[in-house]
Amino acid sequence: MYDLTLLLGHGVGVGFSVEGRYIEQWPFLSPHTGTKSNVVVQDNIEGWAFSFYIQLVNAFDGIKTVFDYSKIRPAGAPLLTRGGTASGYELLERAHVAIQKILDDRWCTQFDSVDIFDIACHIAGAI
């Protein structure tokens, strides 16, 4: 999902396959341990990609990720290197919340192809 986010963030269209034979190789999500990991999201595409990556990695270890969006420019702020304006953190936060719901619904079970596709769509919607 990290690579997916980077490619989307750089304006590249992305297609992928969610075949069951590959999804079956993914581990089950661990039971929630009650542990939380605080992550400050950096204001660049790599920071956004890392936030999705760490959210999934933590979920496999039973850890819930709590995000701090304070470093992200507000909506409408100019983007100096790429032109245009910043979207703000709201779409990213919405994607994190939606992905967390999928993760919460799958504790101690395995993802299916719809889960993976939904996660990818939430990421694309944020980028």
Q: Which positions does each model-derived feature cover?
A:
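Extended catalytic cores of very large enzyme megasubunits
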Residues: 1-127
